[in-house]
Amino acid sequence: MDKFKTIEGINSMNSVDDQTGQANRLATFEDVHGLKSSDFEVFLQNIAPFSNSEGKPYVILDGMGGYGDVTAHILAEAKKSNNVPEMYIADESVNQLQRGVTSGTLPEDFAKDHLVVTDIRETPFSNNLFDTVVIKMGIHEVPLQEQAKILKEVFRILKQGGKFVTWELAFSNKESQKIFQDILRKKDEIAGFTQLVSNRWFPTEEIRQSFEKAGFVDVDSPHTLEPTVNLRKRESELSSVERTKLMQKNGAITVEENDSLIKLGKQRCDELVVFTKQYMTSVTSDIKQAMNYRETEDNVIFEPEKKIFVGYKR
């Protein structure tokens, strides 16, 4: 396989993505979305198999893979049957890729030259390279007009007969989509994720048509997931920009600094809860019910719609 720009030899402290919101987010997907282990089991079932009928390992790309959580789950599942695929992780954030190594999310023996620094909309990979491409909750991170580029690029780098599996938001109505988008944009604004505020666009069920326009066939959404968004679970994320800057400056965080960051995260979460409660006063009861929206004295909880989509390149 050709050489790509990987995390080896890159000084993440000086990389351009330190100024973007995505690179500074230090929250785990599982924490902020209240996922169950069964959700990932279903996801893995749709990604499988990990080799062909002759036992040759598949080449799988974890696109927009961040710190490698999906890859770690795939490898753990595949090792149960001694059926380990060749994994690559692609992400434009050097920080996120390096976090996969330093946090222990990825196995110690994971090849560093398989951590590829690239924008998923225009990758360095050759045509027809991967047996499977996976993207978990990544498509919504780019503007609406750019999302089609992701699907077209995935189609290009997939082998004939290859499979694309994505776990993504898929709102059944535009009202719920707008509510979720407005609340998450406010969260990003409070946290200082300036790039995410302007870039994010959360899909509706129309994403199925986008798959087909890109060339995918037999597009299906075999599973609907019901994760829980608990705003209080966002406290650490809301102070992660400051936490990252302190780590970059000093290499460590003191007890006093950590206490201040915890306090800052709580204060910002208080602000987000107040905003959300006020925002939801104008939302109809049927939409609230569809979102399973509920409030407590200091928290807001709701359940966005997410689905697993599968499409094939024939």
Residue ranges and their predicted role:
Residues H33-P57, H73:
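Conserved alpha-helix/loop element of class I SAM-dependent methyltransferases that forms part
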Residues V165-D188:
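Conserved class I S-adenosyl-L-methionine
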Residues K3-L44:
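Class I SAM-dependent methyltransferase Rossmann-like catalytic core
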Residues A148-Q160:
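A short glycine-rich, Lys/Arg-flanked "PGG" loop and its adjoining helix->strand segment in the class I
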Residues L61-E122:
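Class I SAM-dependent methyltransferase SAM/SAH-binding core
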Residues D220-R314:
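Conserved Class I S-adenosyl-L-methionine
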